[in-house]
Amino acid sequence: MPELPEVEVTRQGIAPFLVEQTVVDLVIRNGSLRWPVPDIAKQIIGQVIRQVRRRAKYLLIDTDAGTSIVHLGMSGSLRILPHDTPVEKHDHIDLVLANGRILRFNDPRRFGAWLWCELPEEAHPLLAKLGPEPLTNAFNVTQLAAALAGKKKAIKLCLMDNHIVVGVGNIYANEALFAAGIHPEAEAGKIDIERLTVLVAEVKQILAHAIKQGGTTLKDFTNADGKPGYFAQKLHVYSRGGETCTSCGNLLSEIRLGQRTTVFCGICQTR
């Protein structure tokens, strides 16, 4: 599943081709995504795209009439292509621009979404209760400590809770906890401020590095120009259960936590 770095890389890739361009058509070939795609042709045709933003794992394509809210789901991708590019399987939506290009949404598993919002996006049900962005100053040790106070849940589950901090999915939660030396099952409310300070710093550093490297190379992810990301070559624990720890040489443990595969080093990461 594309996580925050992959979505940000996509935003950076498509934004230069969309901003200040006029929409001349919206082609919906298959509107049966995670939620039905609304018929917004009348609202969006003739509109100028003002900016392309990201909130958590959602891409926001702003016009004066409203905002398209796009989620890549498990396997979705967005590509900038010439308008006459042949349609392939799973090419569900084309946003057609006056400059002869299209923004094409492809999603084999159809867990993605393309929605429309005419209200300030902060009021949309999908966005209204989201926590702070991890790469902003709003995500800091004071905020995290307050959010975790009294919580008995495993720290990894809290780190992946979008009400606490957005966009830290399974890959980067595994990696950040390893870098911070914190066991993923550690009780969140009992982690001291010093360790939380390290964790916040590692989350920021790992996400920023992943964005710089172009996102994580996984089976379904390619960035906006069709090229794979490169960060997977640098993963220390994710998907490496049973292999040796890159720090101490111990065999990495693999468990299920919150129905997600979790990999950690029982020596380097403590409760």
UniProtKB/Swiss-Prot annotation:
Belongs to the FPG family. Its EC number is 3.2.2.23, 4.2.99.18. It comes from the Bacteria. Pfam families: Fapy_DNA_glyco, H2TH, zf-FPG_IleRS. A zinc finger (FPG-type) spans 236-270. This is Formamidopyrimidine-DNA glycosylase. It catalyses: Hydrolysis of DNA containing ring-opened 7-methylguanine residues, releasing 2,6-diamino-4-hydroxy-5-(N-methyl)formamidopyrimidine; 2'-deoxyribonucleotide-(2'-deoxyribose 5'-phosphate)-2'-deoxyribonucleotide-DNA = a 3'-end 2'-deoxyribonucleotide-(2,3-dehydro-2,3-deoxyribose 5'-phosphate)-DNA + a 5'-end 5'-phospho-2'-deoxyribonucleoside-DNA + H(+). Binds 1 zinc ion per subunit. PROSITE patterns: FPG_CAT, ZF_FPG_1, ZF_FPG_2. GO terms for molecular function: 8-oxo-7,8-dihydroguanine DNA N-glycosylase activity; class I DNA-(apurinic or apyrimidinic site) endonuclease activity; damaged DNA binding; zinc ion binding. The active site is at residues 2-3, 57, 260. HAMAP family: Fapy_DNA_glycosyl. Monomer. Keywords: DNA damage, DNA repair, DNA-binding, Glycosidase, Hydrolase, Lyase, Metal-binding, Multifunctional enzyme, Zinc, Zinc-finger. GO terms for biological process: base-excision repair. DNA binds at residues 90, 109, 151. Disulfide bonds: none annotated. Involved in base excision repair of DNA damaged by oxidation or by mutagenic agents. Acts as a DNA glycosylase that recognizes and removes damaged bases. Has a preference for oxidized purines, such as 7,8-dihydro-8-oxoguanine (8-oxoG). Has AP (apurinic/apyrimidinic) lyase activity and introduces nicks in the DNA strand. Cleaves the DNA backbone by beta-delta elimination to generate a single-strand break at the site of the removed base with both 3'- and 5'-phosphates. NCBIfam families: fpg, PRK01103.1. Its cofactor is Zn(2+). Coiled coil: none annotated.
